[in-house]
């Protein structure tokens, strides 16, 4: 293995960067909600859903593929082959993203009118198509720098990109868009696209400065397609179903007599609740980003013991971390949503989804480990099953049960996906955690929430929950002396 910073310190570095970026992103979401309202946020979410589908289709699995194939070459001590891997990835990306961009431009009016329901955003769809190849090529370069363990460089560029993007976007919103929701959508897409241009040029310049001597040309196409196509199918299916859901939800909610403003209710959950729910995930996204190439390198080098060790530690960390924020978000939900959005109803929805935090956070890590071990085809199967169920549940439940039906569908499908993913991981690594560990963790979370909820002051609730949860986890021996020694060792290690 290369003698570079351990994965723990790289994860800390990415965590710091991701936290800063998430603070900025959440603040921007608050700014937008105050400027264009819940209905405007709902329209923006629909536009971004279509854009997200196009981006996923244009990426066609290339970001993870570039990361995986680069890590594989480095794990086999063949750095001279990386140039040919990148060359193949770039050509693949240009073909896929170019094709999707053309389709977006040709069908922009139909997408805006029939899918989104607002013909005025057709220009926004075309604007997104213009920047699509840039975003996809940026994904290739980010995958390379992550696999090459150049985390510091990547973090610096990402911070600079975010500063550039936010500055441009806020300027466009303030001086041009005003409170016009369609112009606000265009401003967000324009700012993001120009930020992607900055990132791509920066990473290409830094790669060129490496002056690595390439080896003899190697065949890449078959390996690339074997990796990228299953990923593309899984990602496209997941994104496609997600887009269908987002476009369908307001229309099906309109049939429910309990929902006065379906677009506002949809915007409240997707544009207000989910950003808060997923804000603490910065550390796990950082870890997941590093686990894919790390597992690929270990698998290529035959380091099965290290794979098992990392899988056990990562899954345990995600479970405990999710448990911590499960209770905090549940107990502080009303205060957070009133402070951020001046919206008490969003607090009710945040309480519902906060209870799912341990499962959602663990699923992020599990998915990364499976991809790092080359199990892309399994991901396709799981996404087909759960996504199909999600659409069926939403179609049937929303007109009768409203947002309660939305939550039920979210719970069942995400739980099923998580169970299938964990089952696949355990087949590859063997037993990682005793079944008693998640059960005792859940018991500790429930008791800590119940006792802390008796307090009225929000700060007191939060502090009491942290202390109670930590004490109960130690009492139940979920956190052992071995864990404490491990943490101390990480802190002391140079």
Which positions does each model-derived feature cover?
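N-terminal membrane topogenesis motif
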Residues: 1-24, 80, 84-87, 218-238, ...
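Signature of the first transmembrane helix
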Residues: 6-67, 94, 101, 105, ...
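Short runs within selected transmembrane alpha-helices of multi-pass transporters and secretion channels
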Residues: 21, 29, 60-67, 127-146, ...
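Interfacial/gating helices of multi-pass transporter permease domains
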Residues: 32-53, 181, 185-186, 222-227, ...
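Helix-loop junctions and terminal segments of transmembrane helices
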Residues: 60-75, 278-303, 311, 315
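Hydrophobic transmembrane helix module of multi-pass membrane transport proteins
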Residues: 93, 97-240
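Membrane-proximal transmembrane or re-entrant/amphipathic helices at the cytosolic face
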Residues: 452-494
């Amino acid at each position: 293995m290369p003698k570079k910073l351990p994965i723990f310190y790289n994860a800390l570095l990415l965590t710091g960067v991701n936290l800063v970026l998430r603070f900025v992103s959440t603040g921007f979401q608050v700014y937008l909600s105050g400027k264009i309202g819940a209905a405007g946020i709902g329209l923006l979410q629909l536009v971004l859903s279509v854009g997200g589908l196009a981006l996923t289709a244009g990426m066609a699995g290339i970001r993870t593929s570039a990361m995986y194939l680069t890590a594989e070459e480095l794990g086999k001590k063949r750095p001279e082959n990386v140039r040919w891997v990148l060359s193949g990835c770039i050509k693949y990306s240009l073909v896929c993203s170019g094709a999707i961009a053309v389709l977006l431009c040709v069908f922009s009016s139909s997408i805006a009118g029939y899918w989104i329901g607002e013909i005025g955003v057709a220009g926004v769809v075309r604007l997104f198509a213009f920047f699509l190849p840039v975003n996809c090529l940026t994904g290739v370069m980010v995958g390379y720098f992550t696999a090459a363990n150049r985390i510091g460089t990547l973090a610096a560029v990402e911070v600079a990109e975010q500063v550039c993007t936010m500055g441009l976007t806020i300027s466009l919103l303030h001086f041009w868009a005003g409170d016009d929701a369609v112009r606000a959508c265009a401003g967000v897409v324009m700012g993001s696209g120009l930020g992607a241009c900055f990132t791509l040029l920066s990473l290409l310049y830094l790669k060129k400065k490496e002056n690595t001597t390439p080896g003899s040309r190697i065949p890449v196409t078959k390996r690339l397609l074997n990796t990228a196509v299953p990923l593309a199918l899984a990602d496209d299916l997941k994104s496609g179903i997600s887009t269908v859901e987002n476009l369908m939800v307001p229309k099906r909610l309109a049939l429910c007599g309990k929902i006065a403003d379906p677009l506002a209710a949809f915007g409240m959950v997707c544009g207000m609740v989910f950003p808060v729910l997923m804000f603490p995930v910065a550390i796990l996204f950082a870890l997941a980003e590093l686990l894919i190439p790390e597992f690929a390198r270990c698998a290529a080098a035959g380091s099965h013991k290290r794979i098992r060790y990392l899988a056990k530690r990562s899954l345990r960390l995600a479970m405990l971390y999710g448990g911590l924020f499960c209770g905090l978000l549940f107990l502080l939900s009303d205060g957070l949503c009133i402070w951020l959005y001046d919206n008490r109803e969003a607090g009710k929805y945040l309480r519902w989804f906060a209870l799912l935090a341990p499962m959602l956070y663990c699923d992020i890590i599990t998915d990364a480990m499976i991809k790092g071990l080359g199990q892309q085809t399994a991901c396709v199967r799981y996404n087909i099953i759960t996504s199909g169920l999600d659409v069926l549940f939403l179609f049937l439940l929303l007109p009768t049960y409203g947002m309660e039906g939305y939550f039920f569908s979210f719970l069942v499908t995400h739980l099923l996906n998580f169970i299938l993913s964990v089952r696949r991981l355990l087949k590859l690594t063997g037993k990682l955690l005793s079944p008693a560990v998640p059960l005792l963790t859940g018991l500790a979370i429930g008791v800590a929430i119940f006792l802390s909820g008796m307090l009225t002051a929000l700060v007191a609730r939060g502090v009491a929950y942290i202390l109670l949860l930590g004490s109960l986890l130690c009492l139940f021996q979920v956190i052992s002396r071995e864990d404490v020694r491990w943490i101390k060792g990480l802190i002391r290690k140079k």
